[in-house]
Amino acid sequence: MVQKVLSRQSDNSQDVSAEQLDVVESGSIDQQNIRAWVVRKVKENDKRTSTNQSFKWEAVKPASCLDAANEKFMYLHGGREKSGISNSLFKLDLDSCTVYSHNRGEDNDSPARVGHSIVCSADTIYLFGGCDSETDSTFEVGDNSLYAYNFKSNQWNLVSTQSPLPSPRTGHSMLLVDSKLWIFGGECQGKYLNDIHLFDTKGVDRRTQSELKQKANANNVEKANMEFDETDWSWETPFLHSSSPPPRSNHSVTLVQGKIFVHGGHNDTGPLSDLWLFDLETLSWTEVRSIGRFPGPREGHQATTIDDTVYIYGGRDNKGLILNELWAFNYSQQRWSLVSNPIPILLSDSSSYKIVSKNNHILLLYLNALDAPKQLLCYEADPKNLYWDKDKFSDIPVLQHISMKPSNASNHTVSLGYLNDRPNHSKKNSVTSTSSSQFNNFLEQNQKAVRSARHRHYASLDEQGLHSLRNLSKTSGMNHSADFSLHEFGQADPFAYEIEKPIASLPLPNGNDTISRSSESSSPINESESNSLLKLQSDFKFSNSDDRVAWLEEQLLYCMQQGYTLKPPNLFQHVDEKLRLEKKEQLSYLEILKVIEQMLESNEQKFKKQIVSLASENAKLAAQRDAAVENANYSRSLIQKKTTDETVGSLIEKVGKLEYEVQGTLEEATSYYQKNTELQQLLKQNESASELLKSRNEKLCVDYDKLRSVFEEDSSKILSLQKENENLQSQILQISEELVDYRSRCEALEYGNYELETKLIEMHDRVEMQTNVIEASASALDVSNTAILSFEDSLRRERDEKSTLQQKCLNLQYEYENVRIELENLQSRALELESALEQSVSDAKYSKAIMQSGLSKLLSSINENKDNLKEFSKSKQKISYLESQLEGLHELLRESQRLCEGRTKELLNSQQKLYDLKHSYSSVMTEKSKLSDQVNDLTEQAKITQRKLSEVQIALADSKMNQQLSGKDSTDVHLPTDFSASSSPLRSYFNEEDSFNNASAAHSSKESDIPSGGVFTKYRNHFGNLMTSEETKAPDNNDLHKRLSDVINSQQKFLSLSPQVSKDYYDVRSKLNDTAGSFSGEEMRAIDDNYYASRIKQLEDDYQKAITYANCSDESFQQLSHSFM
C-alpha cells in the first residue's frame, strides 16, 4: 500500500496527480530527494450511509478545518464549504489509510465550527471555540463552549462549566496533557489574545440525552441535541511566573519534552516567526533564540513532534502565499534545519493539508480541490531519509555576537528606503545576500517600530555588526576558505531568492538627498588604500569584502523579521543610566548639568570618529567596486580566447554574478552615505541641544539660590518638629509597654481560670470513678461472703461424710458381703465432694482476688485525691461516705480472715506449704518470677504430707480393726488371711480407689486454674499404693502409738505457724506420753479422729491462703500478709 511516487510500475501510481508528475518530470526538483517521500492512497470505508457518498472537502480552505490525532487515528472536523460552515467529522485510520465518517445524516448533532480547536484522547474528542455563523466571513465572533464527543455512545456532549469562562475566540490552540486541556491565544472581535486557560477533564458526568432534551431550550436546536454535565466544572487561569508572549492567533503548537511549543502566528503587526516554550511545571514562558537560520514569519502552519524534534510545515507569509517548506527544530541543540526534499505537491488556496507523526514517520494528509477527480493523498517520509540543510559550522552563534536592547516602541525610526525587486548576490562560493524584494516585504518607507515589549531594536547596528565580525574572527578560530557558503551563517528560507533575475536599479535613499553613482565609481584608489583593503579582508577572514557585506545585510533582515528595527544611537542613554545610579545621592542641578555637558562632548567626539570611519569605508567600497570591474573585464577577455561552450557558459554566469556584486557594493555605499548624512544631522541637533542646556543652566543657578534660602528656613522648622516627634514617640512607647503588661496580666488570669476549671472537672470525674469502684468492690464482697458460706457448708458436709466413711470401715469385718456396694457409693460421693471442693476453692480465690484488687485501687485513689477534695464540701461528704463503706469492707475482710484462720485447724499438711510461703515472702519483693517455682515446691511438699497422712489413716484403721478383733483372738491381733489377700474387701476398696484417683488426676490436670485438685488426688494414690503393698499385719497398741509419735515428730517444725494446731499437737503428745499403754480402743480412736480432723481442716485453710497469696498483686500481697500475720 506504500509506494514511491516515481515508481510507475505499481498499480497505485495513478494516485499522484498530473500536476505533481509535471513537477517531478520537469527536473526543477531533484528526483533522488523526492524518492524519500512515499504516497499512500486513502480509501473510503465501504460501510457508509447514503448521506456519505462523497467527502465535502472540495472547498475547504487551508487550516480552516481542525484535526486531532491519537496513537492510531486522525480526526478532521468542521471547516468552510461552498454551502457554509461544515459540521462533518471524519476519522482516518493511520495504519490502513481508511476514512470513516461519523456523520449521521439528519440526526447529526455535531456542532458546525470553523476556526475552532479540537484534541482527542483514547475515547473522547474535545472541541472548544470557533465560529458557527455562516454570515461572518472574518470569524471575529467566536464561541466559548466546550464540547465532548464520546466514541462509545457516538454523541456530542456540551460540557457545562461555571464562570468565569474563557472569552470567545477563534484561531487559538488547544492541547491535551495528562487529562488537562491547555488553551492559548486566539482572536476575539478583532483583538488578539495571549492568555492561557486550564480545564481538567477527569470525572465529567453527563446525563442521558432524553433527560437533556426535556430541559434544554427548544429555540436552540443545536444545544437541544447536546448533553449537559450533571456536575458543573470550571476553567482555571493559572498564575504565570513570567510574562506572556505577544498576542497572536493561527499559530502552531505541539508538545515537546513536557513543554508546550508555540511558533509563529499572526497579530496586528502581521505574521510572526518567534518561538516560545511554556513549562507546565513552573508555569513560565521562555523565548527561544535559536542559533543560525530560522523559519520566516508565517501563520496557519502545522506542527508535530518526534522524540525531541519539532517539525513544522506550510503556512502563509505576509503576502498570503502558501509556503511548501518543512522545517525541523532540534530541542536539545536549539537549532533549525530546512529539508532539501520538497514535498511533491502543489499548494493552493483550495488545498488542505494536515501533518502528524506515526511510528517515527511524518504523515502529510493532503487534498487538492483542483484535481479531477478529487483525491485525498497521504504522504509519508522517514526524517532520517531526508536531507537537511544544516550549518557546516555549528559552533558559530551568529546572532549571539549582536547585543539587543529593549525598544521603547518610538514612532521615529530610521528607514532603509525602497528596494527594487532585484536580488543582490556576492561572488561565487561566497555568502549570498538577501534579495531586495524581501526588503519590500518588511522595510517599507517610514516604517515604525513594533509596539511590543518583546520586540527589540539595535543601538548603532553598523557598529555592532562590525564589532561582531571582529569577535567572530577572534573567537571562532576557523579558516574561512574560498568555498565558504551562505549556510555557514544561516540563510533563512523562505527568503531564498532565485539568481536568474537581473537587477534593474539600485535602491534610492530616503529624503531629497541623491548620490551620483558615476562620481562615486570614478573616485581614484591609491595603493595604500588597496593595501588597507587587503588587510581588512584578512582580519575579517572573508574571501572578499562582498561576503562580509552580504552577511551583514542578511543578518539585518533577520533581525527586522523578528520585530527589530534600526535606530540611531541614543545620545542620552548613558546620561540616563548615570542619573539613575546617582539619584539616591541627590546631586544638585549644577552637578547634573556638568555631567550632561561632559557626555555631550564625548558623544560629539564619537560621532566625529564614526564620520571618519564611514568615509574610509566608502573609499574601501569604491576600491572593491573597481576591483570587481577589473575582474569582470578580465573574465570577458578569457571568454574571447576560449572556444569551449562549457567554458563560455560558466564565464558568462560568472560575469553576471560579478555585475550583481558591483551593483550590490554600490547599494551598500549609498546606504552608508545615507547613514553618514543622518549622523551629521544628529550632530547638529546635539549642538543646538547643548546651547539650550546652557541657557537652562543659568536659570537653574538662580532657582538654586532661592531654593537654598527656602531650605534653610524649612530646616529649622524640621528640627522643632523632630523634637516634638521624639516626645510623642516616647509617650507612645510608655503606653505600649503598659498595654503589653495589661495584656500579659489578662492572659495570666485567663490561663489561671482555665486551669481551675480543668482541675474542677478532673476532680469531679475522679470522684465519680471512685464511687463506681466502691460500689463494684461492695458487690464483690457480697459475692465473696456467699462463696465463703457455701464453702463452709461443703466442708461441714465433707466432715460428716468422712465420719460415716470411718464408721463403715470399722464395720467391714461384720459386713463383708455389703462392702463392695458401700465402697461404690463412697467413691461417687468422694468425687462429688472433690468437685464441690475445687469449685468452692476457685470461687473463693476469684472473689478474694477481686476484693483485693478493688481495695488496692480504692486505697490508692483515696490517697491521691484526699488533698484535692478538701476544698469542696460535697466531695468531703462523699469521702466520708466512702470511708465508712471502707471500714465496713475492712470488717468484712476481718471476718473473712477469722473464717480462714478457723479453717487452718483441719489440714496439717498445709503447714509445710505455709512455711515455704513464708520463706519465699522475703524474696518475692525483689524477684517475683520465682513465685511460680515456690508454688510448685509447696505442691510437692503437700504431696509428701498427704502421703504421710494416708499412712497414719491406714495405721489408724488397722488399729481399730485389731481392737475389734481382739475380743475373738486372745493371743494374736493379726488380720485374717482373707483380709490380707488381694481379694479382701479393704484391698479391693483401695484398688478401686486407685483407679478412681487416676481418673480424678486426669480430670484435675485439665483444671489448670485450680491447683488443689492434683494434690488431693496424689494423696489418695499414695494411700491406695500403701494398702496394696506387702501383707499388712495388725500392730498392737504400742506399735500404733510409736508410729503416730514418729509422724507427729516429723511435722513438729511446721506447727509453729498455726498456734491452735500447735496447742492441739502438744496436748496429744502429752497424752500419748502419759498414757502410752493405758488407752482403750475407743479412746484411742476418738483421740485420733479429733486430731486428724483438726489437721485436715488446718491444711485446707492454709492451702487456700497460699493460693490467695500467689494470685494477688505486690501491693495487695503486702497488705494481706500484714493483716494475716
Curated annotation (Swiss-Prot):
Gene3D superfamilies assigned to the protein according to its UniProt record, in alphabetical order: Kelch-type beta propeller
Localization annotation: Cell tip
SMART domains reported in the protein's UniProt record: Kelch
SUPFAM superfamilies assigned: Galactose oxidase, central domain
Compositional bias per record (Low complexity), positions renumbered to this chain: 515-530
Kelch repeats: 73-123, 124-179, 181-226, 259-308, 310-360
Region of interest (Disordered), ranges: 507-530
TM spans (from-to): none
GO biological process: cell growth mode switching, monopolar to bipolar; establishment or maintenance of bipolar cell polarity
Any single Pfam family the record assigns to this protein: Kelch_KLHDC2_KLHL20_DRC7
Origin superkingdom: Eukaryota
Main location: other
Keywords noted in UniProt: Kelch repeat, Phosphoprotein, Repeat
Primary role: Acts as a cell end marker required for efficient new end take-off (NETO), whereby growth is activated at the cell end to generate bipolarity in extending cells. Also required for proper placement of the septum.
PANTHER family: RAB9 EFFECTOR PROTEIN WITH KELCH MOTIFS (PTHR46647:SF1)
Protein name: Tip elongation aberrant protein 3
Gene source species: Schizosaccharomyces pombe (strain 972 / ATCC 24843)
Organismal lineage: Eukaryota, Fungi, Dikarya, Ascomycota, Taphrinomycotina
Name of the encoding gene: tea3
